[in-house]
Amino acid sequence: MLKNLFRKTKYITVSQKNIENYKRENTPTIPDGMWVKCNKCGEILYQNDLEKNYMVCNLCGNHFRIGAKERIKYLFDKDTFKEWDYKVKTENPLNFKGYDEKIENIKEETNLSEAVTTGKGKIAGMEVVVCIMDSKFMMGSMGSVVGEKITRAIERAIELRMPVIIFTVSGGARMQEGILSLMQMAKVSSALAKLDEEGLLYICVLTDPTTGGVTASFAMLGDIILAEPDALIGFAGKRVIEQTINEKLPEDFQKSEFLLEHGFIDKIVPRSDLRKVLAKLINMHKNSF
């Protein structure tokens, strides 16, 4: 009996790898992208519910940034949108180092050809020409192709006698294209001047963020200027302005609510109401088409 008392105890060795495998096999898995955290209130939101609510937080009303494809889905009558000029190719006129590779990588990641999608479609049965900028493609920066596509869309709107709607979201001019990028400000503005001469309607919808050269040109030229709630809209950054004038700016400076209060825009429209409001505005002006 004493002999059995001092006998070595039998045991099983479990490696760290076996423990990790056990945890992996027995831990419930949640598919990627099923839940999203609101970056304003911190609420964890179910992705499907968020999409049904136009990518707007149902707790705090925060408008998530959305791309061109989502806007087309929310805006147009089903299967009426026809894209234009998607084959226009971005060049590297200044031979900016790494620019070609960056463009190709972004194209693969986003499945977008450039930072703006243009075309025509129907809103409540009424045909319109639309240009939708997308922040996923180099933060919606305005290069020569962006300016060219928007200009072509405006020129076609004149030919077809249709109103133009532009959704803006941009970090400004694309630095990799230098002065050619800045030239697009005048180019698009000139096309809009011709649209105005023809008596056709131009509605601009400002989304978060709309800054730099886009703000300084076609974003502020609309006959009617709308904006989404809490959108950042301005030219230079807030800190740059504060350092320049040596003054502290209001907390809501450059927000769409601040711009509405000071007469820079006409109306703030929640995303869920945007299609209805645009349809009403187009219908009010349809005699000019």
Curated annotation (Swiss-Prot):
InterPro entries (UniProt xref): AcCoA_carboxyl_beta, Acetyl_CoA_COase_Trfase_b_su, ClpP/crotonase-like_dom_sf, COA_CT_N, Znf-ACC
Keyword set, alphabetical order: ATP-binding, Cytoplasm, Fatty acid biosynthesis, Fatty acid metabolism, Lipid biosynthesis, Lipid metabolism, Metal-binding, Nucleotide-binding, Transferase, Zinc, Zinc-finger
Subcellular localization: Cytoplasm
Superkingdom: Bacteria
Keyword set includes Zinc: yes
Residue positions binding Zn(2+): C38, C41, C57, C60
Molecular function via GO: acetyl-CoA carboxylase activity; ATP binding; carboxyl- or carbamoyltransferase activity; zinc ion binding
Pfam families per the UniProt record, alphabetical: Carboxyl_trans, Zn_ribbon_ACC
Record's cofactor remark: Binds 1 zinc ion per subunit.
Zinc finger (C4-type): 38-60
GO CC, alphabetical: acetyl-CoA carboxylase complex
Cofactor section: Zn(2+)
Catalytic activity: N(6)-carboxybiotinyl-L-lysyl-[protein] + acetyl-CoA = N(6)-biotinyl-L-lysyl-[protein] + malonyl-CoA
Functional pathway: Lipid metabolism; malonyl-CoA biosynthesis; malonyl-CoA from acetyl-CoA: step 1/1
Listed GO biological process terms: fatty acid biosynthetic process; malonyl-CoA biosynthetic process
Keyword ATP-binding set for record: yes
Role this protein plays: Component of the acetyl coenzyme A carboxylase (ACC) complex. Biotin carboxylase (BC) catalyzes the carboxylation of biotin on its carrier protein (BCCP) and then the CO(2) group is transferred by the transcarboxylase to acetyl-CoA to form malonyl-CoA.
UniProt record similarity statement: Belongs to the AccD/PCCB family.
Protein name as catalogued: Acetyl-coenzyme A carboxylase carboxyl transferase subunit beta
